[in-house]
Amino acid sequence: MVKIKICGITRLSDALDACFAGADALGFNFSSKSPRAIAPERAKEIIEKLPPFVESTGIFVDQSPEEINALCQYCRLQIAQLHSEQYSPEQARSITAAKVIKVFRPEENFAVEEVFAFAQNSGINAFLFDAYRPGMAGGTGETIEASLATRIFNELGNSCYAILAGGLNATNVGEAIRRIQPYGVDTASGVESRPGIKDSREIRSFVKAVHHGGH
């Protein structure tokens, strides 16, 4: 079954709505430039109240590996998502407080050899692919061009855990799953009423669409 991450959580009520709807993971954005940014203290409070079997993910754009390790320990994050091109394989390997997901924002000429090289040099086996938009690290609401996403995921095969993000919502996620067959899907803006504020009905609709699309 395709895994589901609801990203950009800023409120406990939204976190619990996502959990009870069937999300497998929640994302907390620690980039101060994001409209979905959350303070570590608030993230910790929310994570402490989550039910078991739901993983908490920290989204990091400009923190050092040392800062990431400290935040993962403080907030009890299970996953560190490196949402920036600045992180090298060596830096990723030095993050030991949580499992690491490396994000790529592919353009038309993207070569999957970049993924293979990063995996080999870092030991990471989970990668997320988000839509590319100059000057923005994610949460744009834009989708990856369909043929590009299909090519990348086909070429990756079963070499890693590949997660699809970028403009996914209840309307388009089912078709994306059938076409691309990702390990998991990730959405933020696709289940919001405004940045950082989730819509419980949209969350339920998204989860339902994922489950239907995966069959």
Swiss-Prot record:
EC number: 5.3.1.24
Enzyme class at the top of the EC tree: isomerase
UniProt-recorded Gene Ontology molecular function terms: phosphoribosylanthranilate isomerase activity
Gene Ontology biological process: L-tryptophan biosynthetic process
Catalytic activity field: N-(5-phospho-beta-D-ribosyl)anthranilate = 1-(2-carboxyphenylamino)-1-deoxy-D-ribulose 5-phosphate
Matches recorded under CDD domains: PRAI
Cysteine-cysteine disulfides: none
Record pathway: Amino-acid biosynthesis; L-tryptophan biosynthesis; L-tryptophan from chorismate: step 3/5
Bilayer-spanning residue ranges: none
InterPro entries linked: Aldolase_TIM, PRAI_dom, RibuloseP-bd_barrel, TrpF_fam
Keywords from the named record: Amino-acid biosynthesis, Aromatic amino acid biosynthesis, Isomerase, Tryptophan biosynthesis
Record-stated family: Belongs to the TrpF family.
Entry-linked PANTHER family: N-(5'-PHOSPHORIBOSYL)ANTHRANILATE ISOMERASE (PTHR42894:SF1)
Name of this protein: N-(5'-phosphoribosyl)anthranilate isomerase
Organism classification: Bacteria, Pseudomonadati, Chlorobiota, Chlorobiia, Chlorobiales
